[in-house]
Amino acid sequence: MQVVERQVFDIVALNVVSSIPDFQAQDQRNRKFQLRMLRQAIERSPEELQLIVGEVLGLPKRKQEELAKLLRRTTLSAIISAAKLVADRLDFLAGLETMLFDAELKKHFKERSQLHRILADNTWVFGEEFALTVDDQSLTEVLRQCLKATGHEIVVNERVKRVDGTIGIVDLMLSRRVPSAREDEHDHLVVELKAPRVKIGMAETSQVKGYAFAVQEDERFRGVPARWTFWLVSNDMDAYARNEVRQANCPEGVLWESQDHRSRILVKTWAQILHDCRTRLKIFQNELNHNADRDASLDYLKQTYARILQGTHSTGDAEQEDVPGQDVDADDLVPSV
């Protein structure tokens, strides 16, 4: 407190104590709370405090009792953090949707340096149960992390290559332990992202098949108890890809599945992924009565990821897309052993 504020506080506090006969008889915790509220009102602009106190005092008696019960089980800070987490996620989804589907913005929304980087910080979009293990690295690093997760201490010297002999760089790999009698079994989700303006077609499906087949054919992966799912993600797909994921005796969206059902490829659109995310958050959104405004959500995304999203308003050239089969990683510049 500044000197003047301290003097004001002392004067007002003295008057409170002398003017309220039963103040000294109150519980010490209540006395501290009241004096703390008084200090906050003097130190800061009173609008925030008035809003908070007004909301609490305006609660129906039943809601006040519910809040009191909650505060006996957790802290107000934890309650606020939980509500903020849901509100932030709803704003994130609305902002991301705008970036992905706005006709002008998506022209300049880059896959590798922007979309990829944002999603690496928000892997909950692909499922709450997963954690990021590989970010924009080679299939060789995927093998290393897969072995590490299951406790295999094996040195990987020879690089993993696709069936055609080329090197592959995966965008994101997420992992989780599968509830199973076999404690070392894991689920791995490999996500291949495409810029929103890129329709999934033959080149893109061939690229992700190359990753899946590399895992399927490399004998070093076979000794690791794991299930593999590959997602190929963009806004839309062309007629070729649509026919590939609409085959008889196979669920729609499945591009390929191994005979042992332990490895498969799914083609996902952002509309499907965003819908699934909102469905998971729907009950919390209803209770929070939170409506994610388009402009406010876009501002939230741009403020949170200001450094990453620089240039999304520019009219410069769009980012050069990766050519399937020609991915390059620093680790792959070293000659094979």
Where are these regions (language model features)?
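Charged, terminal alpha-helix-loop-beta segments
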Residues: 1-337
